[in-house]
Regions:
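Perimembrane helix-loop-helix junctions
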Residues: 2, 186-219, 286-287
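Hydrophobic, aromatic-rich transmembrane alpha-helices
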Residues: 2, 97, 269-296, 300-306
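Transmembrane-helix motifs of polytopic, lipid-linked glycan transferases
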Residues: 86-106, 145
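Membrane-interface transmembrane helices that cradle and orient dolichyl/undecaprenyl
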Residues: 107-110, 144-168, 200, 274-294
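Hydrophobic/aromatic-rich transmembrane helices and adjacent perimembrane loops
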Residues: 185, 307-344
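Short periplasmic/luminal acceptor-recognition loop of GT-C membrane glycosyltransferases, typified by
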Residues: 192, 371-425, 432-452
Length: 485
């Protein structure tokens, strides 16, 4: 068994490295990751690498573990996304291996590895994967592992989870909480089922024991951050930026139910190759009398909780559905059950190899990022604009998110508010206005629209056209230079 698992883990690592090499814009095959969200993450990580304290010295809105990952990535490469690619590999490896272990509960080793590979390829080529490097991507292994643990426990007995497994689930939940806490819906569903089983077995004392074990696990990845921020006098900054502002100030106008349903249909369509199998698999599992009632209830509760978290907590973005991708593995499990009814095919090793090879071909040909693969940084807007800036010049992205010029120009923001985030925060807008009005940075970058005329201490130095989120060359970038006094 250990040898089998070791070989499976090695295969998952190789598959992850190649899939991401082909499909993620963080890989060495791409000149830069064009996604503004990913650039924000890496810019913050680069600032942290140089000693900046998150939330206190530089403002962003996601969880601290995500920025630590990017600080480590900046240690690998401070001038490219190669470090992010290096850290994407263990994340996807863990997700593939968790999927393998989940499938292995009900299938043979060959099918489990082949199905995990195909699931991984469908995930990294889906619309929700975007250009690579999202909070959802780094939460995927944690969510898939939690699903595998829950299935392993409740699939063998309708009793509360054993303490060590429950503690580990708590650790996974704590990891998610320190990356993006709005992705905790699946863990809420797991806790609801665990609480019900504990109450049934031993009443309130048993339920409190389960709650204590789970919360103790959550505290393991959370407490070090509390200590870190307290030691740096940034505890209030962390609470305000990550909790308060995201709850009360994030996003724009509330979407109507019609708008939400429209978004749901559109995003499901862009992720149909794993979303439809996930939905069919969940429906088949709910009706599968060969599984325990506890596991059917738990998986349904986890899926419902995550679905609610993705679609009804805050705004829905193109990448949001990646938080549901773990449930695509349930579709693979139910496919195996259906295949067993008509007889298992022979040549399992050959089929496994074929599935793995097909997954790599899929990652190469089906990724929507292929348009950028093989280009050089000098061929795209970020590289050309960076060439217009002298070495050592300071920069501020005045409007929109980070378009990648901080990275391409090998510079870092000097201001706490370095981009315009989707947070209705007056202090951020005022700080950006003040920096440009007082001509603090040498250069100012704006996207889509020209710099307002009131900021007359800058002159246009260069403009270029970059790619928008639909991979079209229609996003105009304007680079302004401070006028000589």
């Amino acid at each position: 068994m250990k040898k089998e698992r070791g070989l499976a883990l090695a295969a998952c690592a190789a598959l992850a490295a190649l899939m991401l090499l082909f499909a993620s814009q963080c890989s060495p095959l791409y000149p830069i990751n064009l996604w503004d969200d990913a650039n924000c993450l890496l810019t913050v990580g680069r600032v942290m690498r140089r000693g900046g304290v998150l939330y206190r010295d530089i403002y962003e809105q996601k969880g601290p573990l995500l920025y630590l990952i990017h600080a480590l990535a900046a240690c690998v490469s401070d001038t490219s996304f190669w470090g992010v690619y290096a850290l994407e590999i263990p994340a996807l490896t863990a997700a593939l291996y968790a999927a393998y272990r989940l499938l292995r509960l009900r299938t043979g080793a060959g099918f489990a590895l082949g199905a995990a590979a195909v699931w991984g390829a469908l995930t990294v080529t889906s619309g929700s994967f975007m250009r690579g490097d999202s909070a959802e991507e780094f939460c995927l292994p944690l969510l898939t592992a939690a699903l595998a643990l829950a299935y392993a426990e409740y699939g063998r007995r309708a009793r509360p989870m054993r303490a060590k497994r429950l503690l580990l689930c708590g650790v996974l939940a704590g990891g998610i909480a320190t990356i993006k806490y709005t992705l905790l819906g699946a863990m809420v569903g797991l806790c609801a089922v665990e609480g019900a089983l504990a109450l049934k077995e031993g009443g309130a004392p048993r339920a409190l024991k389960s709650a204590g074990v789970f919360l103790a696990g959550m505290a393991i990845p959370i407490l070090p951050w509390v200590i870190y921020f307290a030691a740096n006098g940034a505890l209030r900054d962390a609470y305000t930026a990550y909790i308060y502002n995201n709850v009360f100030l994030y996003g724009g106008e509330a979407a109507s139910w019609g708008q939400r349903l429209g978004e749901m249909a559109r995003y499901v369509q862009k992720n149909a190759l794993w979303a439809i199998p996930a939905a069919l698999g969940l429906a088949a599992l709910a009706a599968d009398r060969g599984e325990t009632a506890a596991v059917r209830l738990c998986v349904a509760a986890m899926a419902a909780g995550q679905f609610a978290a993705v679609f009804f907590v805050g705004r829905v973005w193109a990448y949001s559905l990646l938080g549901l991708a773990a449930f695509g593995v349930i579709g693979c499990m139910q496919l195996h059950r259906a295949l067993k009814k008509i007889g298992c095919p022979r040549g399992k090793k050959a089929l496994t190899a074929a599935a793995c090879a097909a997954s790599l071909l899929l990652a190469w040909f089906a990724t929507p990022n292929a348009f950028l693969r093989g280009q050089k940084i000098e061929q795209i807007a970020q590289g050309r604009l960076a060439a217009a800036m002298p070495e050592g010049a300071t920069l501020l992205q005045y409007s929109h998110l980070d378009d990648g010029l901080y990275l391409a120009a090998h510079t870092l923001p000097r201001e706490k508010y370095f981009v315009l985030l989707n947070v209705q925060l007056e202090a951020m807008r005022d700080a950006l206005d003040r920096a440009v009005r007082e001509a603090v940075p040498d250069y100012v970058l704006v996207s889509w629209r020209v710099l307002p005329a009131e900021f007359d201490r800058y002159e246009l130095a260069a403009s270029d056209v970059g790619y928008d989120d639909d991979n079209r060359l229609n996003k105009t970038l304007y680079l302004y230079r401070r006028k000589s006094e």
